[in-house]
Amino acid sequence: MAFPLKDDLGRAKDCWGCSSDTPALSTCSNADIFRRINAMLDNSLDFTGVCTTPNTKGKCEHLQDYPDTEGAAASRMLFSTSHEPLPRGLPDTNDLCLGLQSLSLTGWDRPWSTQDSEAGGQSSTPTAAQSVFSMLNSPMGKPSPLGFLPLDPIGSDLVEKYPTHLLRSSRFDSRSILDSRSSSPSDSDTSGFSSGSDHLSDLISSLRISPPLPFLPLGSGISRDPLRLGVGSRLDQDHAALAAATASPLGITKRWPGTSVWPSWDLLDSADDPFSIEREARLHRQAAAVNEATCTWSGQLPPRNYKNPVYSCKVFLGGVPWDITETGLINTFRVFGALSVEWPGKDGKHPRCPPKGNMPKGYVYLVFESEKSVRALLQACTQDLLSQDGLSEHYFKMSSRRMRCKEVQVIPWVLADSNFVRSPSQRLDPSKTVFVGALHGMLNAEALASIMNDLFGGVVYAGIDTDKHKYPIGSGRVTFNNQRSYLKAVSAAFVEIKTAKFTKKVQIDPYLEDSVCQVCNAQPGPFFCRDQVCFKYFCRSCWHWQHSMEILRHHRPLMRNQKSRDSS
């Protein structure tokens, strides 16, 4: 059954109110597509009032019957970014939306209209032919005739109208709306047209329509005009509805737009090496060896005046003969008391056997059972007093099978050198504490505090990390009384210390504590990013998520040294 367009006098009318003698709507570029659509609908459409051949001789002058109101002008500017009124007259078919968006989304021709209450009591669905005719018989800017079924506004019941996989997009794209299928029941009047076959969808997608509705960035400082304000506010509500209706946040993030600066959770699922963070953290501990110092301290270390010092039971033995054995060491030093030997190993560990076929690295550690044994050993050593610094070096002569009377250096540790407090009443704040690594063995807590105070100021405490025998392990902590000094020290990162006896480059990092992840606040946060852009604790997943961004990939993680935690 055909549905001709007739006026009150029985004459065929086009959609602009013109007689059939002068076709008002030139659809020549889409004529073939309209004919094929009509054929698929069993010729239920009548295009009597629609031009199918080019016509440039005349234009409809009956537009003056409908005065240009502000709403009418705005309706013609639906996709225009300019505020200037369009010239009066018939627009080109490429500029007209032709209502084709209504095939996939109701209310496209009136997106800014508030029709919620208007359409609340009506539930009937227009037929396929009526949908096409409404697009031709209701010009934009012309009031709808009485009895016209109000269309739903954009965004109403989106969750019900569109499949879930289309809604899981972080950006409300008009292209996805046009490409989506209707959710009308299969037995409804519009099911065959709206859902249709793939061939029909291809025909509709071939039609030339105007550009999609431009979206204003949310949260931007650009003010919206009254026309766009309605659209934007409705879209803002739709964004909130979509976020609430989406079952899994993971589905949203996996479909994040490619232009977003935020990373995708897909990177978490495809981590090549789950222990890459630990490896980078271990490498960072030796960063002082490959990085240049940002500042240098040179001077004289504070003098040491000990009264009845107490020593660690562990001593360092440097310059030992290369062919020395553990048996030879025990036989040489057991005259001072019972002892054991710790050989240097990888990662600062000290196994109880010589490495690689009894070949030592030139130094070992002796661990006596009593502190009195250390005192006896030092009394048997020769001392070289170091002028000005008040330091003294201890040397002991020993022999091996191939070396006779070899002098080895004995370096003890005074327990009082492990901590230095400048202000006993000052509360120590871990958030203003730095970790100092790669310390020289001659640096005690007082010397470390003096150097850091000269460089950054505000030092209230310095401590040297020790093992279970209370012997230093080459790292320390410094606490400041203000945030500025703390940040200056962290920013310095690498400091070179020059004295008359040694030159050493130390490494400064934030002091780490046991903390929860400061991103998700759910998992433990063993990884810390020292870059000022982040400067927080992360769990493994949150670290990969944040640092998968290209601008943050160069950040290196920090981890607490398990050995220092157990020993100090």
From Swiss-Prot:
Identify residues that carry Phosphoserine.
S138, S174, S210, S248
- Matching Gene3D superfamilies: 3.30.70.330, Cytoplasmic polyadenylation element-binding protein, ZZ domain
Q: How is it modified after translation?
A: Ser-174 phosphorylation by aurka in immature oocytes is essential to trigger CPE-containing mRNA cytoplasmic polyadenylation and translation activation and the subsequent signaling events that result in meiotic progression. Ser-174 phosphorylation recruits the cleavage and polyadenylation specificity factor (cpsf1) into an active cytoplasmic polyadenylation complex. Ser-174 phosphorylation increases its affinity for cpsf1 and papd4/gld2. Heavily phosphorylated by CDK1 on serines late during oocyte maturation. Ser-210 phosphorylation is sufficient to target cpeb1 for degradation. Ubiquitinated. Requires a PEST box and the proteasome pathway for destruction during oocyte maturation. Ser-210 phosphorylation triggers its destruction, an event important to allow the transition from metaphase I to metaphase II and cytokinesis in the early embryo.
What keywords were assigned to this record? Answer: Activator, Cytoplasm, Cytoskeleton, Membrane, Metal-binding, mRNA processing, Phosphoprotein, Repeat, Repressor, Ribonucleoprotein, RNA-binding, Translation regulation, Ubl conjugation, Zinc
Residue ranges occupied by any RRM domain in the UniProt entry: 313-410, 432-513
Instruction: Name the segments for region: Necessary for interaction with microtubules and localization at the mitotic apparatus.
Output: 172-175, 182-191
Pfam families cross-referenced by the UniProt entry: CEBP1_N, CEBP_ZZ, RRM_7
Q: Provide the residue span(s) of the region labelled Necessary for degradation by the proteasome.
A: 181-208
In the record, what terms sit under GO molecular function? metal ion binding; mRNA 3'-UTR AU-rich region binding; mRNA 3'-UTR binding; mRNA regulatory element binding translation repressor activity; ribosome binding; translation factor activity, RNA binding
Give me the Gene Ontology terms describing cellular component.
centrosome; cytoplasm; membrane; neuron projection; nucleus; ribonucleoprotein complex; spindle pole; synapse
Q: InterPro entries from the entry?
A: CEBP1_N (IPR032292), CEBP_ZZ (IPR032296), CEBP_ZZ_sf (IPR038446), CPEB (IPR034819), CPEB1_RRM1 (IPR034977), Nucleotide-bd_a/b_plait_sf (IPR012677), RBD_domain_sf (IPR035979), RRM_dom (IPR000504)
What Gene Ontology terms for biological process does this UniProt record contain?
cellular response to amino acid stimulus; cellular response to hypoxia; cellular response to insulin stimulus; mRNA processing; negative regulation of cytoplasmic translation
Q: Assembly and interactions?
A: Found in a complex with cpeb1, tacc3/maskin and eif4e; dissolution of this complex results in the binding of eif4e to eif4g and the translational activation of CPE-containing mRNAs. Found in a complex with cpeb1, cpsf1, the cytoplasmic poly(A) polymerase papd4/gld2 and sympk. Found in a mRNP complex with cpeb1, a guanine exchange factor xgef and mos mRNA. Interacts with cpsf1, papd4/gld2, tacc3/maskin, microtubules, sympk and xgef. Component of a ribonucleoprotein (RNP) complex, at least composed of cpeb1, lsm14b/rap55b, ddx6/Xp54, ybx2/frgy2, pat1/P100, eif4enif1/4E-T and eif4e1b.
- Biological role: Sequence-specific RNA-binding protein that regulates mRNA cytoplasmic polyadenylation and translation initiation during oocyte maturation and early development. Binds to the cytoplasmic polyadenylation element (CPE), an uridine-rich sequence element (consensus sequence 5'-UUUUUAU-3') within the mRNA 3'-UTR. In the absence of phosphorylation and in association with tacc3/maskin, also acts as a repressor of translation of CPE-containing mRNA; a repression that is relieved by phosphorylation or degradation. Requires zinc for RNA binding.
- Family statement drawn from the similarity comment of this UniProt entry: Belongs to the RRM CPEB family.
Protein name per the record: Cytoplasmic polyadenylation element-binding protein 1-B
Look up and give the organism this protein is from: Xenopus laevis
Question: Encoded by which gene?
Answer: cpeb1-b
